[in-house]
Design a protein with these regions (language model features):
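Phosphate-binding loop of NTP-binding sites
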Residues: 5-148
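Phosphate-bearing ligand-interacting subdomains
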Residues: 1-3
Length: 148
């Protein structure tokens, strides 16, 4: 899967390198934080795209997503759309599932925000224990979010 994410990054021409990437992770507050960062960047004159729980936004466009952090092929396709639309920044929610499933492979974030960590998302469909969840969130500062 990691190789696939990096391959899709190359397939779409490395769109994340054409924008300032801001990644937001944490148990709670990702959506609110991404909206606030987007508003600040827009007020500063940037053309901003946003990817997360509420979908994809870029000037004049909005559409829904199935996942907070889309699968790697879909994510790279979205980033290409944002870059082609002239976005110079992208603010995105980065879920622990997105990290665990290598959906963000190939993306280097210039800015990383870690909101908080609570013992949520524990169960058969997500993380087997809080320790595992904490480990994946912690990986944000190493492999998945290497530019932090």
């Amino acid at each position: 899967p990691l190789r696939h994410g990096a391959a899709f990054h190359r397939l779409f021409g490395r769109p994340a390198l054409e924008m300032t990437m801001v990644g937001v992770t944490g148990t709670k507050g990702k959506t609110t934080t991404t909206h606030m960062i987007k508003a600040v960047l827009e007020a500063a004159g940037h053309k901003v795209g946003m990817v997360g729980t509420n979908g994809v936004y870029y000037p004049g466009h909005h559409y829904d997503l199935n996942n907070t952090t889309p699968e790697s092929y879909e994510l790279q396709k979205i980033l290409r759309q944002l870059a082609d639309a002239g976005c110079d920044a992208c603010v995105m929610e980065v879920s622990s599932q997105g990290i665990m499933m290598d959906r963000v492979a190939g993306i280097h974030y210039k800015v990383g925000v870690f909101t908080n960590l609570y013992p949520d998302h524990i169960g058969p469909g997500e993380h087997s224990s809080f320790e595992e969840y904490r480990s994946w969130k912690g990986s944000c500062s190493s492999a998945a979010m290497s530019a932090w």
